[in-house]
Structures are given as structure tokens and as C-alpha cells.
Regions:
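Helix N-cap at the start of a conserved alpha-helix in ABC-type nucleotide-binding domains
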Residues: 5-7
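A short, surface-exposed alpha-helical micro-motif characterized by mixed small hydrophobic
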Residues: 37-39
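ABC ATPase "signature
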Residues: 55-56
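ABC ATPase nucleotide-binding domains
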Residues: 70-89
């Protein structure tokens, strides 16, 4: 669902905090916004046209090259606080 920035960041902070608990329950997070890939998320799967486009460790997959190919347009990924941010070139 499309949360406003404040609500989104609150939800992501709760997920990040809960992931650090000793008895943390693994979770799958589905999003269209790469900036929502929090530090607790270690691996990603990118889907395109209903098929797996790429999967693996987030730092290996969320790159300028992979995302530019997937989105069919030039993009740049900037990492800030272990979170990726997408910039359209």
C-alpha cells in the first residue's frame, strides 16, 4: 500500500528493529520501491513480466547496470545508511 513517508519509515524501522531480536521471524517484503530495502534485507529477487529477472545478495543485484537493464532506462543507485536510493539519469 502507498504509505506516506513518515508512516513508511516507521514501518521500516519496526521491521529493522524486529529483525535484530534473537527470535526474529524471517519475512518476505514485497515492494516496487528499492529505497525500502532496509539493512535487515540481505537478498532480493527482481521480477519483470512475471518472471525472475535477477536474484541474489542485494549489493550484487541492486546496481546501476542490473536496474538500468531491468527498467530499460539509465538509472544510478546511491547507497546511504545501507539502503539503496534510485536516481533516474
Amino acid at each position: 500500500s502507498g504509505l506516506d513517508v513518515k508512516s513508511r519509515e516507521y514501518l521500516l524501522s519496526v521491521l529493522e528493529k524486529n529483525s535484530k531480536n534473537e527470535n526474529a521471524i524471517p519475512f518476505i517484503y514485497v515492494t516496487h520501491q528499492i529505497e525500502e530495502v532496509i539493512p535487515a534485507i540481505t537478498h532480493v529477487t527482481l521480477l519483470k513480466d512475471g518472471k525472475v529477472f535477477a536474484k541474489g545478495r542485494k549489493k550484487d543485484i541492486l546496481t546501476d547496470e542490473v536496474l538500468s537493464e531491468m527498467f530499460e532506462m539509465p538509472v544510478k543507485v546511491v547507497w546511504e545508511n545501507d539502503r539503496p536510493w534510485l536516481i533516474v539519469k
